[in-house]
């Protein structure tokens, strides 16, 4: 009965080996030929104690090859020589505790054929791994080939180094001499770089300080050039428009009048003198206009630049705040304001507007005003500017102090006109409220004195602010025609 069971068991094992024989041929061939790309250097070191109790350390270098039945990494430890038959007694004696955290060395001597499976390389590697060894050194390679068999189970996780015949003999003699002297032999395994210039190690960019600096500068240069291109593309239309408007402003400067400033000795002499060229043009335009085209006073012009009653124009430039000297050349803008050419020319070329009234010298118009719907909500500002329908009627009351300041100059002018030439209420034309002029710059100077008033005269689409002194000079052609025709 036992014989029958033994025969059945052997038959099953043989059939299993036959089924798995063909897939494992490749493993057997690789293990037998030992053609592996990775090799290892084995440094064997032992300390000799001389007679004078001095220590002498001796190190030899051996060359081996990583076996496919184990892993391939660098390690080290003390060397322990183990018999090749110790793995066969694993069931009876158990694991070998002497190789724990050491490197066992197994020398294959003449091994009988019936013991081939017991002393095979994969069995030795698994036994050393289970015993806690750091690595396994076997040799010679010619005898290891005869003990190989198809690997039925996965390989070991510790490095397995196979030595050739010459290296095995050197290691054997070194261990023998160290054993005679009673020295502990240590072993260290490291990789061998057979090809110093491997293709895999060729690097296009080496991370050196110079290369990193050059790369950073190149990136900064690329970003800077990209930003320049983007800014140029985005600002190109604006630049063309600015150049075009600047050329138009330069053309407008060539068409503006330049006059010499002259101071008058007294007011009476100035009244008898010939009016300035600006008011001469105003008088000529008024004489050519219709009877109903009257120059109505705009109360918003009361906030214009204050002028002294004893002078015919501004005494100083509002830009540089320098007083005008006799014979100084002044540039007269289309709106009537005067400045030093050196002060106002750069401003007009860049801004194209009068610094005082914001009159556009290129398009020749004032800034756009708000719509009537928006102006209806500003009753506190426009109510004080509404004209009177009759001489006896006062201006509408307003909470602001500005309306009080505006009514008194009007009354002063009203009393200055003789009663004989004072118009009746039914002849006075109806005054339409004008929208306040929007100005981007704040009010620069305080209101003029009470006995002064400015008339905003609109001629040919242009507007000019005239001081009371000019009004006194031009009263002969301003007030009298009104009394005879419309007033």
Swiss-Prot record:
Which residues carry a glycan? 10
Q: Which cysteines are joined by disulfide bonds?
A: none
The pathway to which it is assigned is: Protein modification; protein ubiquitination
What's one GO MF term for it? ubiquitin protein ligase activity
In the UniProt record, the signal sequence range is 1-21
Q: Which Pfam families match?
A: zf-RING_2 (PF13639)
Task: Please tell me in which tissues this protein is expressed.
Answer: Expressed in a subset of head, ventral nerve cord and tail neurons, the excretory canal and tail epidermis.
Sorted alphabetically, the keyword list is: Cell membrane, Cell projection, Endosome, Glycoprotein, Membrane, Metal-binding, Signal, Transferase, Transmembrane, Transmembrane helix, Ubl conjugation, Ubl conjugation pathway, Wnt signaling pathway, Zinc, Zinc-finger
Q: What ranges does the Cytoplasmic topological domain annotation cover? A: 232-487
Q: Give me the segments passing through the membrane.
A: 211-231
**Top EC category:** transferase
The membrane topology of this protein is: Single-pass membrane protein
What's the domain remark here? The RING finger region is required to block Wnt signaling and is also required for endosomal localization.
Q: What is the protein's known function? A: Probable E3 ubiquitin-protein ligase that acts as a negative regulator of the Wnt signaling pathway by mediating the ubiquitination, endocytosis and subsequent degradation of Wnt receptor complex components Frizzled. Acts on both canonical and non-canonical Wnt signaling pathway. Plays a role in the migration and axon guidance of different neuronal cell types including CAN, HSN, AVK and AVG.
Q: What is this protein called?
A: Probable E3 ubiquitin-protein ligase plr-1
**Source organism of this protein record:** Caenorhabditis elegans
């Amino acid at each position: 009965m036992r014989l029958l069971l033994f025969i059945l068991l052997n038959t099953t094992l043989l059939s299993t080996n036959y089924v798995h024989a063909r897939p494992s041929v490749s493993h057997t061939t690789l293990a037998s030929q030992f053609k592996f790309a990775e090799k290892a250097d084995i440094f064997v070191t032992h300390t000799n104690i001389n007679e004078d109790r001095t220590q002498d350390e001796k190190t030899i270098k051996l060359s081996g090859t990583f076996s496919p039945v184990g892993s391939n990494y660098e390690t080290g430890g003390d060397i322990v020589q183990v018999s090749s038959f110790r793995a066969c007694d694993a069931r009876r004696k158990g694991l070998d505790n002497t190789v724990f955290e050491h490197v066992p060395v197994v020398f294959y001597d003449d091994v009988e054929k019936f013991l081939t499976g017991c002393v095979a390389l994969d069995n030795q590697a698994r036994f050393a791994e289970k015993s806690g060894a750091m690595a396994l050194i076997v040799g010679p390679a010619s005898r290891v080939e005869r003990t190989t068999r198809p690997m039925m189970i996965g390989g070991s996780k510790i490095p397995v180094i196979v030595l050739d015949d010459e290296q095995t003999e050197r290691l054997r003699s070194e261990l023998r001499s160290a054993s005679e002297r009673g020295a502990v032999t240590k072993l260290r395994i490291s990789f061998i770089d057979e090809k110093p210039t491997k293709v895999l190690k060729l690097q296009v960019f080496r991370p050196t300080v110079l290369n990193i600096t050059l790369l950073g500068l190149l990136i900064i240069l690329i970003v800077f050039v990209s930003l320049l291109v983007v800014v140029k593309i985005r600002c190109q239309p604006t630049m063309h428009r600015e150049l075009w408007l600047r050329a138009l402003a330069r053309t407008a400067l060539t068409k503006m009048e330049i006059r010499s400033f002259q101071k008058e000795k007294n007011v009476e002499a100035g009244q008898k003198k010939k009016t300035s060229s600006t008011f001469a043009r105003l008088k000529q335009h008024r004489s050519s206009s219709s009877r109903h085209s009257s120059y109505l006073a705009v109360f918003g012009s009361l906030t214009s630049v204050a002028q002294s009653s004893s002078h015919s124009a501004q005494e100083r430039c509002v830009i540089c705040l320098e007083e005008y000297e006799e014979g100084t050349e002044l540039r007269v803008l289309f709106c009537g304001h005067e400045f030093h050419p050196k002060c106002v020319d750069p401003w007009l070329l860049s801004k194209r507007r009068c610094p005082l009234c914001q009159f556009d010298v290129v398009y020749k118009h004032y800034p756009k005003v708000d719509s009537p719907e928006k102006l209806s909500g500003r009753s506190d500002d426009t109510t004080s500017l509404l004209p009177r329908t009759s001489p006896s009627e006062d201006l509408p009351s307003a909470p602001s102090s500005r309306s009080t300041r505006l009514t008194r100059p009007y009354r002063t002018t009203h009393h200055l006109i003789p009663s004989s030439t004072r118009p009746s209420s039914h002849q006075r034309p109806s005054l339409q409220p004008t929208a306040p002029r929007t100005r981007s710059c704040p009010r620069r100077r305080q209101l003029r004195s009470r006995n002064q008033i400015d008339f905003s005269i609109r001629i040919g689409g242009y507007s000019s602010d005239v001081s009371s002194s000019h009004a006194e000079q031009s009263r002969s052609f301003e007030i009298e025609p009104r009394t005879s025709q419309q007033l």
